[in-house]
């Protein structure tokens, strides 16, 4: 469903040259879900780096309470069998992981302590099989976003959370988000 009925919802093409017209006294949450414009390096740069610069240009003078940036566990270089944690040093070797990490750093410089980064594992829904050992159902991704919109944690710095469901083969830790009280639901 591409329709969202709400007077408090704004949709905008973040690669557009059009200016975003917002007259707001307070914005509780902005959720940015970047998407590559194509699957090559240029598409990733457009979808992550250029689009987030455009959004920042439009929002930098607005009173935003929290900015939720959707990211990916692709930033982890998973050549070993160790479990990846949010505090691990990032050493992405392929262009997608490097660009996504650059995007995260850019977002942190833009939004500072207002920023929450959610690193999603491979998205699936009920019509798709879980295709990797690290995954998250689309509904759990939406629930994680909702969790951070509804809770007021008052973080003192940018916070990053891995969003990956429990599985016997998972190499991505989800302990940090679960320690705040988030529960992953089970979907077929």
Segments and roles (model prediction):
Residues 77-80, 91, 95, 116-132:
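Flexible, glycine-rich beta-alpha linker
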Residues 99, 116-117, 128-150:
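Substrate-positioning beta->alpha
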